[in-house]
Design a protein with these regions (language model features):
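Transmembrane beta-strands of outer-membrane beta-barrel pores
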Residues: 49-55, 83-89, 104-106, 117-121, ...
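Detector for outer-membrane/organellar transmembrane beta-barrel domains
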Residues: 101-104, 108-155
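Start-of-domain marker
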Residues: 23-85
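Residues that define the transmembrane beta-barrel architecture of outer-membrane proteins
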Residues: 27-29, 61-63, 92-96, 127-131, ...
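Residues on the lipid-exposed face of transmembrane beta-strands in outer-membrane beta-barrel proteins
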Residues: 33-37, 67-71, 98-102, 133-139, ...
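N-terminal signal peptide c-region/cleavage motif recognized by signal peptidases
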Residues: 18-20
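Predominantly the C-terminal beta-signal and adjacent terminal strand-loop region
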Residues: 149, 160-213
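Repeated loop/turn-to-beta-strand initiation elements of outer-membrane beta-barrel proteins
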Residues: 41-47, 75-81, 107-111, 143-147, ...
Length: 213
């Protein structure tokens, strides 16, 4: 028998999906594979390779290679330096970030807050700076299944009042698999380029696979 709590969570996520699906300009998919490796001195290394499709799932958008070095300060508190190399049809874009995150658990719920300052590099263009703040709520349904919900804000850095440039709302589920691997299935609604007259509203459906070395 399915527990009422699980049913309520399912209805809530379905409601959010329906609410954010109206007035959508495009639909994308993000699929990725990655690995994690613990290193000495409380360090860890992560790598992810991702493919993104746009134009109602019909056109190549970009492929992303990202490597990240993280340091565990104390339990729950981490500092990270991610580097991203993204290849588009007509350009190459690089990004370097400095981030910090803190996770607090009170079973079966955990809260995670992440802040990140990122700088994007693109040939013959001015460097772009953004500040990102993200809150993630995770619920432990079982030892292997964890639904989650998150919200994220993107602010332009060093502009008038650090203007809001984009926001994202996401929900999904992380599932632990055998042999130190896991998958994550997720949906993202993102409203980007908010400084423009007509911001872009985009649906994203994603799947990621991660394994630990």
């Amino acid at each position: 028998m399915v527990k009422p709590t699980r049913i309520n969570i399912g209805y809530f996520l379905l409601y959010l999906f329906i609410q954010y699906s109206f007035g959508i300009d495009d639909t994308h998919t993000w699929t990725s594979i990655g690995f994690e490796k613990n290193l000495p001195h409380s360090l860890s290394l992560e790598f992810e390779q991702e493919l993104r499709i746009k134009d109602r799932l019909s056109t190549f958008s970009q492929t992303i290679s990202e490597v990240s070095l993280s340091y565990k300060v104390i339990d729950g508190l981490n500092i990270s330096i991610p580097y991203r190399y993204a290849v588009f049809d007509d350009k190459i874009k690089q990004r370097l970030s400095l981030g910090a995150s803190y996770k607090y658990k009170f079973n079966p719920i955990s809260l995670k807050y992440r802040t990140k300052l990122q700088r994007s590099f693109e040939k013959e263009k001015t460097h772009e700076y953004l500040i990102r703040n993200k809150l993630i709520i995770e619920y432990k349904l079982s030892k292997k299944i964890k639904p989650f919900f998150s919200g994220e804000l993107f602010h332009q850095f060093n502009t008038n009042n650090n203007q809001l440039d984009e926001y994202r709302v996401s929900f999904g589920m992380a599932v632990d698999l055998p042999r130190k691997s896991s998958i994550k299935i997720f949906y993202i609604f993102k409203n980007e380029d908010l400084t423009k007259t007509n911001p872009d509203k985009i649906n994203v459906f994603g799947l990621s696979y991660t394994f630990k070395l």
